[in-house]
Amino acid sequence: LKDMDEEGIDVAVIFGTPVALTVNGLADKGLAQAMCHGVNRWLVEEYLPADSKRLKGVGLIPCQDPAAAATELEFLAKQAGIVSAMLPTNVYGINMGDRRFDPIYATAQDIGMPLSVHPQTGHDGEYGRWGVMGAGSERMEKYAYVHATAFTFELQIALMHMIGEGVFDRFPRLKVAYTEGGAGWLPFWAERLDEHQEKLRPQWPDLQRRPSEIIASEQVAFTCEPEERTLPYVLDRVGETQVMYASDYAHWDCEFPNSVRMLSRIEGLDERRRSVVLGQNAIHWFNLKPEDIPAASVAGRVLAV
């Protein structure tokens, strides 16, 4: 909370614990279910109560067991302070547009809870049996290369596969955010997917809309990095309501305590757009209540400095 004050963050939506990036790769589905439920209870009972207005949580669900994941989603929907549930970009190398995951999407749609896709870098695993894999990781000899590629590539693959396999058409009220991979790739990826749908139409039988239409719809959102100088162009091409600020606190590549200031000073990002990206989009996306937003804005004080 002290660091949030220094950074200028009124409300934080938190992806918590290293368990989040590995639990969906466990071969033992029962263990995965128990770990997800344990972390979720810890969030609700111990972590978020430190300041229930300012701290919001992203719950974990065992996606390798879609029925159990749907049950855990129903549990999360009843917990104060949980505003989303996390999806991996793949489970055992199986992409998230696969229909085996439909029970998760159906439940998320029914309870009105947005899902948040978070990428990963590792490649340990065996297709169809265990592991959550990072695209290209097995070919990279340095972590710098792995991190630079896998996070963004995994989000691109997850978005493409969920669009192409008709997830957003089968579940028209489903909301999914793609996080921690930047936003600068969106205009390029939307154009490329449109081209491939147009020229290879028989391979997209389940898709009822152009990929760019889905990317610009209220069904999907993305997070940006505070240093993305192309952000104004992204908002022009994809839409102002699609992108939310993310601090990436407290990873090695975060800009703490200057990320809010950095984003606010991006050339071409006017005051209205700053307000939208820094707060309004997240308030709408995560269904935050007005009474949960502090009256005396920490961000306002920081930006005034």
Question: What residue spans do the PLM features occupy?
Answer:
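Aromatic-lined glycan-binding groove of carbohydrate-active enzymes
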Residues: 115, 119-124, 163-213, 217
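Mid-to-C-terminal alpha-helical segments outside catalytic/metal-binding sites
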Residues: 1-11, 41-49, 71-75, 165-166, ...
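Active-site neighborhood of phospho(di)ester-bond hydrolases with catalytic His/Asp-centered motifs
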Residues: 58, 86, 118, 179, ...
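Glycine-enriched alpha-helix->loop->beta-strand junction motifs that scaffold or abut catalytic
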Residues: 80-84, 109-114, 171-174, 216-219, ...
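Short aromatic-enriched loop/helix-cap "lid" or pocket-rim segments at secondary-structure transitions
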Residues: 26-27, 126-131, 188-192, 256-258, ...
